[in-house]
Amino acid sequence: MAHAERTFIAVKPDGVQRGLVGEIIKRFEQKGFRLVALKFLQASEELLKQHYIDLKDRPFFPGLVKYMGSGPVVAMVWEGLNVVKTGRVMLGETNPADSKPGTIRGDFCIQVGRNIIHGSDSVKSAEKEISLWFKPEELVEYKSCAFDWIYE
């Protein structure tokens, strides 16, 4: 396989509360991506402010941090060929109204403020987000038995 990359995916509090964690994991697994890390946690305000630092000057920033801290989240790292780009396609548009049926947001969301999932928007962002949410030793290295059936 060509260079595999990693992406950071987080099921937001609304996705956890609505019982969509399993469905989201299922979609990434069925696509052929490999889960290398997973945490179920109540994110601290400090962690969330660091995660969304690029949005700190936007008017919705305080509300976003409050919403993301309102309940538990599921933080994950997925690996595979073009996983950042493909993962974003699987998520759908940030605004669910613009998301196509078949995408996670297109199938399960109505409003942008409750769009159930976050996914890294670039390889650089993924690296930053992964290092923010996970220690290096929390990323598990293994070869999936399905690997040879997914990649040439």
Swiss-Prot record:
Its main location: cytoplasm. It is found in: Cytoplasm; Cell projection, Lamellipodium; Cell projection, Ruffle; Nucleus. Its EC number is 2.7.4.6, 2.7.13.3. Residues 1-66 are annotated as: Interaction with AKAP13. InterPro entries: NDK-like_dom, NDK-like_dom_sf, Nucleoside_diP_kinase, Nucleoside_diP_kinase_AS. SUPFAM superfamilies: Nucleoside diphosphate kinase, NDK. It catalyses: a 2'-deoxyribonucleoside 5'-diphosphate + ATP = a 2'-deoxyribonucleoside 5'-triphosphate + ADP; a ribonucleoside 5'-diphosphate + ATP = a ribonucleoside 5'-triphosphate + ADP; ATP + protein L-histidine = ADP + protein N-phospho-L-histidine. ATP binds at residues 12, 60, 88, 94, 105, 115. Pfam families: NDK. It is an enzyme of class 2 (transferase). The active site is at residue 118. One of its GO terms (molecular function) is DNA binding. One of its GO terms (cellular component) is nucleus. One of its GO terms (biological process) is positive regulation of transcription by RNA polymerase II. Its cofactor is Mg(2+). Keywords: ATP-binding, Cell projection, Cytoplasm, DNA-binding, Kinase, Magnesium, Metal-binding, Nucleotide metabolism, Nucleotide-binding, Nucleus, Transcription, Transcription regulation, Transferase. HAMAP family: NDP_kinase. NCBIfam families: PRK00668.1 (NF001908). Hexamer of two different chains: A and B (A6, A5B, A4B2, A3B3, A2B4, AB5, B6). Interacts with CAPN8. Interacts with AKAP13. Interacts with ITGB1BP1 (via C-terminal domain region). Interacts with BCL2L10. Belongs to the NDK family. Major role in the synthesis of nucleoside triphosphates other than ATP. The ATP gamma phosphate is transferred to the NDP beta phosphate via a ping-pong mechanism, using a phosphorylated active-site intermediate. Negatively regulates Rho activity by interacting with AKAP13/LBC. Acts as a transcriptional activator of the MYC gene; binds DNA non-specifically. Binds to both single-stranded guanine- and cytosine-rich strands within the nuclease hypersensitive element (NHE) III(1) region of the MYC gene promoter. Does not bind to duplex NHE III(1). This is Nucleoside diphosphate kinase B. It comes from Sus scrofa (Pig). The gene is NME2.
